Amino acid sequence: MADNRRRRSLFDFLLFSVFLGLACLCLSPIPATAQRRKLRFSVNGEFKILQVADMHFANGAKTQCQNVLPSQRAHCSDLNTTIFMSRVIAAEKPDLIVFTGDNIFGFDVKDALKSINAAFAPAIASKIPWVAILGNHDQESTFTRQQVMNHIVKLPNTLSQVNPPEAAHYIDGFGNYNLQIHGAADSKLQNKSVLNLYFLDSGDYSSVPYMEGYDWIKTSQQFWFDRTSKRLKREYNAKPNPQEGIAPGLAYFHIPLPEFLSFDSKNATKGVRQEGTSAASTNSGFFTTLIARGDVKSVFVGHDHVNDFCGELKGLNLCYGGGFGYHAYGKAGWERRARVVVVDLNKKRKGKWGAVKSIKTWKRLDDKHLSVIDSQVLWNNSANKLVVR
C-alpha cells in the first residue's frame, strides 16, 4: 500500500510538472531561432546522447499499457513512460536527447497537440537540448507529418528542424537535418565540428502501387546527405587547425534499413532479436551511400520494439534503441529501455582535447535500479589519425 501511495505521489508530481510546463509553453512561446545553441563536447571531453525510441504516447493517465505483467496493469499508463523518461534523464544527464519516431500513437490520440506536448514534456522540463524525427504512427491522428514537425520545431529547447533551408525545395519527408558537435571549449577544435549527427525522415508507408509495406529513405534525402557529408569534410580539412580524414558521424531514423535483416541471434554483437525486422519495403541503397561516404560509424533506429541489438556490417554498426513507451507493444517481463551513446575525445600531450577517440553505447532498463546492460565500444580511433595540427 505504501508503494502505491508513493507511486501515486510521483504521478501527481509529474502531472503537475507537465501541466506547468505546458502552461509556460502556451504563455511564453520561445521562437525556434532563439533556442539555437552551439553543441559542443564537455570540459571532460565527452558528449552523451540519450535515444528514446517508440514512446507511442496517447492520452496520459487514461491510456492503458500494452504487454505488461498482470501485477502492473492496474496502475500502468502513459505516465509510466513519463516517469521512466524523467528518471533516465536524471540518471544519465545527457547532452542531447534524441526521439527516433512513433513519439505519439496517432490512432489512439484524442488531441494531437496535447499528446505531442505531453510526450516531450520531461525533455522540455529538463532544459536539455533535444531533437525528434518521425515514425510511421506520428501522423495518424489529426495532424499531417508536416504539421507534426511544424509544431515540434516551435517547442522549447528543441534543435529539431523541418528540413534544411538549402534543400527544402527538393528533399522528401519532414525532419531531415544535421547537427554539428564542436570540440571542447579552449581546445584548438572548439570552433570545428568533430562529430556530425544526421537525422532523416524514413517515412511511414509506401505510396507506390504494387510496393506495399513500409516507406524508405529516398534518393533526394541521400543526395542531401551526400552533399552535407562532403561539405562537412571540407570544413574539417580546412584552416584553421585542418584535420585529416573526416569527422565521425552518427545517423538516426525510425524504420530499419533492409540490411538489418542480415543479423540473427548468432551475429548480433550485443542485445537481442526477439521479432522479425520490419524493414523498408524496398532497398533504396542508403546503406551503400553511408558506406561510400565513410563518416557515419553507427546507425540508430526504432520501430521493432523488442529488438535492441547492435550488429556490424561492412564496418558500419546497425543498432536498435529498444522499445521505450508503455503504450507501445512490448514483451511482458522484458523491461522498457533506452539507448545511451557516449562519444569521447582524444587527450593530447599538453592536456588539451583533440578529435574523437571512441564511440560507446549501453542501455538503461526501466527497473528499480535503472540497470545498465550491454556496454560496448562501437568505434575506436585506434590509429589516432584524426590529429590536431
Curated annotation (Swiss-Prot):
Keyword Signal appears in the UniProt entry: yes
Highest taxon of source: Eukaryota
Pfam families xrefs: Metallophos
Tissues expressed in: Expressed in roots, stems, leaves, flowers and siliques.
Residues the entry annotates as binding Fe cation: H305
Quaternary structure annotation from Swiss-Prot or TrEMBL: Homodimer.
Known cofactor(s): Fe cation; Zn(2+)
Upper taxonomic lineage: Eukaryota, Viridiplantae, Streptophyta, Embryophyta, Tracheophyta
UniProt entry tagged with the keyword RNA-binding: no
Signal peptide as annotated in the record: 1-34
Compartments reported by the entry: Secreted
Sites where the protein binds Zn(2+): N136, H303
InterPro entries noted in UniProt: Calcineurin-like_PHP_ApaH (IPR004843), Metallo-depent_PP-like (IPR029052), PAP14/16/28/29 (IPR011230)
GO cellular component, one term: extracellular region
Gene3D superfamilies found in the cross-reference section: 3.60.21.10
Ranges that cross the membrane: none
Cofactor binding notes: Binds 1 Fe cation per subunit. Binds 1 zinc ion per subunit.
Descriptive protein name: Probable inactive purple acid phosphatase 29
Family label: Belongs to the metallophosphoesterase superfamily. Purple acid phosphatase family.
Keywords annotated in UniProt: Glycoprotein, Iron, Metal-binding, Secreted, Signal, Zinc
Molecular function (Gene Ontology), one example: acid phosphatase activity
Binding site for substrate: N136, H303, D304, H305
UniProt-annotated glycosylation sites, renumbered to this chain: N80, N191, N267, N380
